[in-house]
Amino acid sequence: MSFRPGSRGGARGGRGGSRGGFGGRGGSRGGFGGRGGSRGGSRGGFGGRGGSRGGPRGGSRGGPRGGARGGARGGAKGGAKVVIEPHKHDGVYIARGKEDLLVTKNMAPGESVYGEKRVSVEEPSKEDGVPPTKVEYRVWNPFRSKLAAGIMGGLDELFIAPGKKVLYLGAASGTSVSHVSDVVGPEGVVYAVEFSHRPGRELISMAKKRPNVIPIIEDARHPQKYRMLVGMVDAVFADVAQPDQARIIALNSHMFLKDQGGVVISIKANCIDSTVDAETVFAREVQKLREEKIKPLEQLTLEPYERDHCIVIGRYMRSGLKK
């Protein structure tokens, strides 16, 4: 009888090995028997988070969501055949290859911010006799960025373009901020406000390589605390996910946003009121924005990238809305 548990363990280990193969280490540990097998199978096989933990390339191979949510370098099939085309929004591009990808021109070539894929393309020189230059683009993942999800969903107006000054509320560790930095380019500025200190540290280290990003570790509810750092801006982007989100946006818009400036807001219904359906929450928030002199231009759901999220584009009318 002493041999039977071992045989069960071996069988389980075999399962772990075969299923854990996606996760690198998960598979190799699976062969050791009982516990190793079960851990190898359950962790390595599922791809989303387990795959990325299991090995260096687990996330990118783990599955459709696993790859999108940020495996080490998953997502793009590039190569010499990639063609870069401009998107309808200035500063945003589409990389056409085996699959079409949303990309931005990398402000810091050679640097990856959150493990995203980079695509290098040779662009011919405008002058005769000058060799072509290599330009690097970064893949903008709509599963990791609400703004990218909105662009993929077909936003008509963005207000974020080369040379613009943008106030970004709720910058987190700088995933989307880095792409906004790419879009506005060296002539533009991104003021990135984040209250939490841990992602704030990552935001600061990202900003060290991008001269057009100004990180501000401060509460967006108190814009007077960073008024000496921020000038008048062309657009405010907000992804703060707080119940008083509309008030936070209004305070910052009144203080920093120029007349007729753009407001781009990502609304997460559950963070504002989880007792009613998402459409009701969105309608209430849009009405609050109207009361704060922000004229809504369009509203777009972020399906299939985010559930119960929408993005609202508005224009700030400093003189007030016409009735």
Swiss-Prot record:
Disulfide bonds: none
InterPro entries per UniProt: Fibrillarin, Fibrillarin_CS, SAM-dependent_MTases_sf
Binding site for S-adenosyl-L-methionine: T175, S176, E194, F195, D219, A220, D239, V240, A241, Q242
EC number: 2.1.1.-
Catalytic activity: L-glutaminyl-[histone H2A] + S-adenosyl-L-methionine = N(5)-methyl-L-glutaminyl-[histone H2A] + S-adenosyl-L-homocysteine + H(+)
PTM section of the record: By homology to other fibrillarins, some or all of the N-terminal domain arginines are modified to asymmetric dimethylarginine (DMA).
Compositional bias (Gly residues): 7-78
Intracellular or extracellular location(s): Nucleus, Nucleolus
First-level EC class: transferase
Transmembrane helix listed as a keyword: no
A cellular component term, taken from the record's GO annotations: box C/D methylation guide snoRNP complex
Major localization listed first in the record, in broad terms: nucleus
Modified-residue entries (Asymmetric dimethylarginine), positions: 8, 12, 15, 19, 25, 29, 35, 39, 43, 49, 53, 57, 61, 65, 69, 73
Positions of the UniProt region annotated as Disordered: 1-80
Top-level division of the source organism's lineage: Eukaryota
GO biological process, any: snoRNA guided rRNA 2'-O-methylation
rRNA processing as UniProt keyword: yes
Similarity-based family: Belongs to the methyltransferase superfamily. Fibrillarin family.
Function recorded in the entry: S-adenosyl-L-methionine-dependent methyltransferase that has the ability to methylate both RNAs and proteins. Involved in pre-rRNA processing. Utilizes the methyl donor S-adenosyl-L-methionine to catalyze the site-specific 2'-hydroxyl methylation of ribose moieties in pre-ribosomal RNA. Site specificity is provided by a guide RNA that base pairs with the substrate. Methylation occurs at a characteristic distance from the sequence involved in base pairing with the guide RNA.
Subunit relationships: Component of box C/D small nucleolar ribonucleoprotein (snoRNP) particles that contain SNU13, NOP1, SIK1/NOP56 and NOP58, plus a guide RNA.
Name this polypeptide is given: rRNA 2'-O-methyltransferase fibrillarin
Species this protein is from: Candida glabrata (strain ATCC 2001 / BCRC 20586 / JCM 3761 / NBRC 0622 / NRRL Y-65 / CBS 138) (Yeast)
Gene name per UniProt: NOP1
